[in-house]
Amino acid sequence: AVMDEQGQPLPAGAQGEICLRGPKVTPGYWKDPQRTGASFFGDWFRTGDIGLLDEEGFLYLTDRKKDMIISGGENIASSEVERVLYQLPQVAEAAAIGLPDERWGERVTAVVVLRPGALLTLEQIRAHCEGKLGGFKTPKEVIAVEALPRNPSGKVLKRVLREELSR
């Protein structure tokens, strides 16, 4: 099932947290009732993945909940922003993260690794993104780095980026 923040099922096409239940789903965390309680809506296990069901019942994974950017009360899937950033020929690698913003809660920030010799400005990124994303999803800031932090299996560590760039 795909559920809202209150644990209510969402209709087809609506994005929410993917929840599971069944005989093979964990009963909880070993000797950690607080974490177990936070991980369930009743008997539905909260996966931490964001997705949606289409009209035919097919499930689409769109993001991780902890990677969701919340700006001005709007949920923004970082993966959606990244797909658009990767369309730019100057971009070798990209990550979209939310950084603290006094007015909006979080601001969409693009962290990019440019191809050798490439140049890219915030204005160029915004112009590219505005036609493909809603205005509130368009990056408000671009930070160029030499490399994105990764775990041993190659996954980008967005938590590390948020910590380092929030200072």
Give each language-model segment a name:
Residues 5:
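Carbohydrate-binding surfaces of carbohydrate-active enzymes
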Residues 69, 95-101, 106-116, 122-167:
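Conserved C-terminal "lid"/linker of ANL adenylate-forming enzymes
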Residues 2, 49-53, 96:
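A structural signal for short hydrophobic beta-strand segments in well-ordered beta-sheet cores
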Residues 84-90, 128, 132:
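Generic non-transmembrane alpha-helical segments
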Residues 1-2, 19, 60, 95:
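Structured core elements
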Residues 8-13, 17-79, 84-87, 103-104:
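Conserved ATP-binding/catalytic segment of the ANL
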Residues 17, 90-93, 141:
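Residues at the N-termini of beta-strands
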